[in-house]
Amino acid sequence: MIKVADLNIPVIEDFDINGRKVLLRIDINSPVDRKTGKLLDDSRIKAHAETIRELLDKQNSVVIISHQGRPGDDDFISLEEHSKILSKYVGREIEFVDDVIGPYAREKISKLGKGEAILLENVRIVSEELIEAPPQQQSKTFLVRKLAPLVDFYINDAFATAHRSQPSLVGFPLVKPSAAGRIMEKEVSALSKIFNKEDSPKIFVLGGSKVSDTLKIIEHLAKNRVADRILTGGLVAELFAVAKGINLGKPNMQVLENKGLLSLIPRARKILLSGAPIEIPVDFTVEKPSGELSNDPENNVSGIIKDIGNTTIEIYSSFIKEGKVITLRGPMGVIEDERFRIGTKSLLKASIESPGYVIIGGGHMISMLDKDVEINPNKIHVSTGGGALLLFLAGDKLPALEALHMSWVMQSGKS
């Protein structure tokens, strides 16, 4: 059992899941090459192998469901290739079934032997899966009514889609004993540290270009007094600098205007006035019109801001070393250009070398991890969350977690 944000999330150990028939919801949604239709990255598929292997080792019959893309998009493809890759990582055959709720799929599920697994076709070929609704409503869909009677347990291991309220994510927990899979368990355990008052000081490193989303996170952290320091970078830092009255120069103001961010200045100013522990860069790496790079102080910027500066890196790194929990989301600079990755990589390095527990989220931030860095799972958590992580940090409810909690309440009679 894991407790997070007043929710009790059941895990596999809370039930006797041995030699049973299990419906496992995973998230193996992967980037697709538009020309060939082949998968470009299989990291999500690889990550789910642990839960599947464990369930098979316990002689369970495992029925796997997942999605890939959305109807009408180039990445809306079959899961047939996924099943082959999944088989490779699990070390056993995961048979692909070209059906979801039809007679063929139901027959395959009924005849599935112990220690065997099948992967059903892309669950989003079922139109109901595209509709978001409350768990009570989703529990009455054809998807749930057709598959639930065929299994004993439901396990959700799809944290990356925990912010969706679709039938495969929230419908089954209301009609079957349900638990979090290993990925879901790790994500929830790591994120619970963020709001655990005993794990302080808490340092947040927030950057990137999704400024409105990041402001929402900061507002929630400030309102609930979660953060001890919020270290800003990227466009988020520029917005706070302007809100503070710092003149970043006409070119940078033009960048903010072109991205429609000037309207957010009053909101950023309100956050500053609330006493939120916001740290703003004291210098920046800028690119001058000539193409020359310069390290300029915040109040004398001579070009377009591309990264945080050297002094800021030193100051931020010292703050990070003090943290008991360090959460990083969003890069400090324009990391698409190798010249402007120093700030992001330096803070990642400081975090990994710090004595604190580190949570790294967001695809851009994760991509900046050096390939040779050894990730100690007891100290560093690399989140697969994406949108789910964003909403969790912003204080929004995650329907999939809410549904697992509801299932526990219904099964145990406890709240």
From Swiss-Prot:
GO biological processes: gluconeogenesis; glycolytic process
EC number: 2.7.2.3
Ranges in a coiled coil: none
Amino acids binding ATP: 336, 362-365
Residues at which substrate binds: 27-29, 44, 67-70, 124, 164
GO molecular function: ADP binding; ATP binding; phosphoglycerate kinase activity
Catalysed transformations (reactions): (2R)-3-phosphoglycerate + ATP = (2R)-3-phospho-glyceroyl phosphate + ADP
Principal location: cytoplasm
Keywords assigned: ATP-binding, Cytoplasm, Glycolysis, Kinase, Nucleotide-binding, Transferase
Cysteine pairings via disulfide bonds: none
SUPFAM superfamilies, per database record: Phosphoglycerate kinase
Keyword check for ATP-binding: yes
Pathway field: Carbohydrate degradation; glycolysis; pyruvate from D-glyceraldehyde 3-phosphate: step 2/5
Localization, UniProt: Cytoplasm
Enzyme class of the recorded protein, top EC level: transferase
GO cellular component, one term: cytosol
Keyword Cytoplasm among UniProt keywords: yes
Subunit note: Monomer.
Similarity comment: Belongs to the phosphoglycerate kinase family.
Name of the molecule in the record: Phosphoglycerate kinase
Protein species of origin: Sulfurisphaera tokodaii (strain DSM 16993 / JCM 10545 / NBRC 100140 / 7)
Name of encoding gene: pgk
